[in-house]
Amino acid sequence: MSNNSNNNIKTYYIIGIITLIFIVSAVIKNQLSSSNQEQQEEEEETDSMGKSKGRGNKKGKKPEKIQEKKLDNHLKNLEKVKLQEDFKLQQDEKQQLKKEETILVEKQEIVVDELKNKKDEEKQQQQQEEDQQQQQQQQQEEEEEEEEQQEIEEDEEEEEGQEQEEEEEQQEIEEGEEEQQEEEQEEEQFSMFGVSIERLMDFQRQEDENEGSDEVEESSKVPIVLSFMLDRIKNLNGFKTEGLFRVNGNLKLVEQLATEGFDPFSDDLDPNVNTWASLLKKWIRDLPEPLIPHELNPIILDFCTNNNINNTCNNNNDNNNNNNFNVCASTNNLGNVLNLSTNICNNNNNNNNNNNNNNNNNNNNDNNNNNNESIEKKITNIINMIKSDDHRNVLYKIGEFFGEMLQEETVLITKINVESLSKILTPSLFKPNNIIDDFSNGSLNGSGNQIPKYLTTLDLPSILLKQKKEIAFVSCLLNYFKDEYSKKLQEQNDQEEDNQEEEKDNQEEDEDEEDKDQEE
């Protein structure tokens, strides 16, 4: 805008100069024309005066005429000289004016040329500016097009990336769904019964890792199903139920719970404590590898032989036992038959006279008192020989449960003592040797981890008779855990007493301080 305004001012200035030149030239021409007219008028007047004087001289004297003529001639000469001078002046002025006109014209031409040059330069500048603007616009348009193209390419890349991510996410979702389905299928196929303790614990640890729980609680060292069954028996007042583990629950329901599983948070669980006690025995009995491994059987037998431990059913009632087993011959489930057989054995023991029982108990107590420390150490060593930590943890968990159950105040209610409980648990803890040998030789078509259900009861009398030493060891094991629980209770009681004494001492000290403060 500033360049355009300056150019306009210059053009107006040049136009003004040109108009002034034309005005000056017009004025000079008018002056020249007016001077020419004056000269003509003077000449006419002189002519008229000469004529009038000539006429007068003709009438006067001749000398006057001559003088007049001389004067006239002199005047004429003067006039001519004057006219010549005036003419020269006029010519000079005309030449000067022409020079000035030529100078003005030249200046005008120069100015016009300058104006043209300036206009041309301005046009060139404008053209250059327009060209530059066009180039800039083209560059901007090209850059914008490139940016748009880049944005389009980036959008396409993003869309491709998003599509790839969506495909990957879809694949991950599908893989996750497949894994979830596989896990669900595995969970559906995975049973808590008839499965090794190691596999149960691996599955449980995997679940804990998936949930992100790093802390290892005491209850998580054993299978959840075991902890639940033990807690369920306690919560249903099992320790206040007479005949616990001797009286069977609903056997069909036990089999159904073991086969189909159960929801521990359901409100429709069976409230009968005997059902859960039977389910616990079945879980122990169905373990592929017994809770006390087979390789420890020779050590256990040597332990029972060297310590003269005998805690079997009364041999005088063998015939009655055989007759009673024949009553159960129609039952196909070995677990149920074993439970019934232990009931018969316990009933026979209860029918023995009190004198024989007292004598046996006194003898056992004497032997236990004499060899208590050595037997306790040997049992501890045998338990420590179990290589699997998971097996040891499960054995201690079950032992702690039965140790609490065998406390004197509980035995008075349940009527289940160490002797009767050892006979109930032995068939579940120790699989009979003849069946184990048949399994190892492949002579029985079992599943490999459970005793076949089609096995009849005809072999049970001989099986139980062969487990006398195992029953004796289980009796020692139960006494061991009973004493351990008693020690634990005693420690807790001592700790509580110590805490109470400390509280009393603290209270007395506080009272003494208050008394001192009051006295002061």
Curated annotation (Swiss-Prot):
- Name-wise, this protein is Rho GTPase-activating protein gacV
Where composition is biased (Basic and acidic residues), the residues are 63-73
Return one GO MF term: GTPase activator activity
Role this protein plays: Rho GTPase-activating protein involved in the signal transduction pathway.
Query: Matching Gene3D superfamilies, A to Z?
Result: Rho GTPase activation protein
- InterPro entries, per the entry: Rho_GTPase_activation_prot, RhoGAP_dom
Which residue windows are transmembrane per the record? 8-28
Gene of origin?
Answer: gacV
Low complexity compositional bias, start-end: 348-372
